[in-house]
A protein has these predicted regions:
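Active-site acidic Asp-centered loop
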Residues: 1-3
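Conserved catalytic core of nucleotide-sugar-dependent glycosyltransferases
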Residues: 5-78
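C-terminal catalytic/acceptor-binding lobe
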Residues: 72-164
């Protein structure tokens, strides 16, 4: 869990139910890349909603996965230690384990199923990695672009078939 993530009371149940339907890495903030640049993406889950399970390229804020899959996070050295662990995990799990990444349903009318119910309130202070004074937004997104491009170069298959 990110430090700004408070899940709904049925988030874990939602993840378990989703695992029965589509086994994979689960998370509350799903990202579907449209391009080799991270900023060009669509969202599923927080802060938007999705009525059905959605396959995504990476997830953040609250991961849910089988313990055995943690081995994939360190299978390769990540391109940076400052940023991008979310995409590195999804890329590595896909490459070495054939594991996909999903965002469980986040229906508008059932917030207790959501993976983050206070993200807007808790995730906008100067302590947030994407907002802090040590890392500019430009540097943060440049690093994320680099992470996307490194994974693509190494064979990451994105939902929309993004290429370098």
């Amino acid at each position: 869990f990110d430090d700004d993530t408070i899940p709904g009371s049925k988030w874990f149940e939602n993840c378990l139910d989703t695992m029965e339907e589509k086994e994979g890495i689960m998370g509350t903030a799903g990202v579907i890349l449209d391009d080799k640049y991270y900023v060009r993406h669509q969202r599923a889950g927080w802060p938007t909603q999705n009525a059905k399970v959605t396959e995504v390229d990476l997830v953040g804020h609250a991961w849910f996965f089988k313990r055995d899959w943690l081995q994939y996070l360190w299978r390769e050295k990540p391109p940076t230690w400052r940023n991008g662990e979310d995409m590195h995990f999804s890329y590595s799990a896909q490459k070495y384990g054939g594991i996909k990444t999903y965002c469980p349903p986040h229906p508008t009318e059932f917030r207790e199923l959501h993976g983050s119910i206070m993200g807007n309130e808790l995730g906008i202070d100067d302590k947030a990695t994407s907002n802090n004074n040590e890392t500019s937004h430009q540097q943060f997104f440049t690093e994320r672009d680099f992470c996307v491009q490194e994974a693509l170069r190494k064979g990451w298959q994105t939902v929309r078939g993004v290429k370098l």
